[in-house]
Amino acid sequence: MLDDLGMTTNDYNTGQTIFYLTFLFAELPSQLISKWVGPDRWIPVQMISWSLIAACQAFIQNKSGFFATRAMLGLLEGGFIPDTILFLSFWYKSKELPIRLSYFWVTYEATAIISAFLAFGFLHIRQSDGTGGWRYLFALEGLITGLIGIVAAFWMPPSPTQTAGRFRGKNGWFNEHEEKIMVNRVLRDDPSKGSMHNRQAVTPRLLWQALKDYDMWLIYLLGLTWMIPNTPATSYISLELKSLGFSTFNTNLLTIPAYIIFIVNLLVWTWVSERFNQRLLLGVGAELWALILLIALETISEDASAWVRWVLLIMLIGMPYVHAIIVAITSRNAGSVRTRTVATAVYNMMVQASNIVGNNVSTSGVLACSRYHN
């Protein structure tokens, strides 16, 4: 793609930064809209909207088009994760939320594995006029997302007590007794969830009260820092593997083990966090995992095999992902619906800020995560 668009690695970095900046600024407004109209309405709108832009990436001709589509994608995708967390909080207790969120991120990484196989196939396609196969990949991914968004628009219920509908069945998914059980179990776990209904807007006064809740600030700080160690490797693994001498086709397949390790770590560490009622110490363990691998990448011989670097990079990308655990802490410690609405968005804004920092570690086409001596 870089060659087709006449771009350098620095241009790609700029595009990533644009995406995360617009994503960051869209987080809180998107969450406030979701709280106002309901996540069951807003999430499908987001998905359909960004799927159109994602598909339009198939037609970009230069880096200006790349920058424009990255900006639009950031604006439309921003807030999707907090919106999803808000929606899930209607259904699950605080101790049930982490593992459900881990399933959410498992599906995200599973799509990365599927995309790697698709990329392997599509990148073999190149028209006689020089059209790259990556264009077909973007078009297909946008189409799939759009179809899922359309299904979600008719399938997502507003709450456990509002599952009846034309496409969900006139009697809904649960009987009245089951609905009472579902609502009572959630409210007994966190009575504050009964303070606002699912289509009640957060007023400016409530927004300010949530923002100045200093008990949440340390969690925001965690969001700003904990992902930086492996962000460069995660974002630029394909470019890095190509710089190590692997072909474009093999590069896509060689990223798959990282996603598999990631999924295993995500599920295991999230389960352990609830099994032993421990969360932040697991986060420390994840950082130690990254530190050991970063030291290895720093001290490895310059003439080391490309396969050795590949193993270290894959293990770094697959580091224990405690995002689901920390997000659940944010929701659990919120203490009110307004704070939960705002805090999940602010936490994710900090995560996007950390992505901006991490993505700009690489500045010259050779990733600092693999060749620190540069």
Predicted regions and their residues:
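Core transmembrane helices of Major Facilitator Superfamily
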Residues: 73-84, 110-111, 315-326
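Central cavity-lining transmembrane alpha-helices of secondary-active solute carriers
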Residues: 17-32, 256-268
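Extracellular/lumenal inter-transmembrane loop segments of multi-pass membrane transporters
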Residues: 1-12, 55-67, 74-78, 89-99, ...
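Central mid-sequence intracellular linker of multi-pass
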Residues: 94-108, 128-206, 374
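C-terminal transmembrane helical hairpin of 12-TM major facilitator-type secondary transporters
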Residues: 276-326
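Conserved MFS/SLC helix-loop-helix module at the cytosolic interface between two early adjacent transmembrane helices
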Residues: 24-64
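Cytoplasmic membrane-interface "Motif A"-like loop-to-helix N-cap segments
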Residues: 35-47, 274-287, 338
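Extracytoplasmic gate region of multi-pass secondary transporters
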Residues: 202-270, 327, 353-359
